[in-house]
Amino acid sequence: GSGHIKLDGCVIGLRPGEENKRRLSTQADGVHCLNTSGHIWIENCDFSFMGDDGTNIHDNVGLLTSNVDSKTVVCQSNLLCEVGDTIEFLENSYAPTGVTAVITGKIAAGSDSIRLTFDKELPDSIQEGCILKNTKYDSSYYYIANNYYHENRARGILAQASQGLITGNKFFRTQGAAILVITDIAQGLWSEGTGVDTLTVSSNTFE
């Protein structure tokens, strides 16, 4: 995935002169970074009137829904992966299992699932409810500073990756939480976040 991304002084807002006609700047997130190689810098920006979150940083994961045989599982298709990728298996609590395996086969399994075959037999502990993480992606290491998030639907910042610093931002009239730290799996809809570790939130203003 892309990495070393910098946004400095960007504005997402209502079109000047059209404020009384159109009250929506975007219908989705202002900035949505997923399945990247991390190192994301967002500073001195103004994000407002989005139809969803101001900033969302995460990697997609897969939810194991069934075991076919000792080397094959079915999971939600939100997991972006290809043959040759290394998958790390996590407990449903996101605790590590110590198990990794390389994908040797991938086919669709219905409209919202994929069937994955691996290069080795999986231990009996890898069962329904486990989380699949593609080690190729890691959106960690992000700096979000001195931005103004205001008057948007949903959250200001949705932080779902590790090694982040969120500092000096101002939040005004966000419909949801100004800063939400979460991992979120809605079966059949989305599966975002690999667990957040080492996140600092400091010197922000909430109104």
List where the protein language model places each region.
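A generic structural motif
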Residues: D69-C75, A108-D124
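Short "repeat-start/strand-capping" segments in structured domains, especially the N-termini
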Residues: S2-K6, G38-W41, S140-Y143, A161-I166, ...
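Short glycine/acidic-rich loop motifs that flank beta-strands on beta-rich extracellular proteins
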Residues: G1, I5-K6, R15-D29, G38, ...
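A structural signal for short, hydrophobic beta-strand segments that form beta-sheets
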Residues: G62-V68, V99-A108, F118
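Ser/Thr/Gly-rich low-complexity blocks that favor extended beta-strand/coil architectures
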Residues: S77-D112
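Extracellular beta-strand/beta-solenoid scaffold signature
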Residues: R22-C33, I57-G62, S70-K71, I126-N134, ...
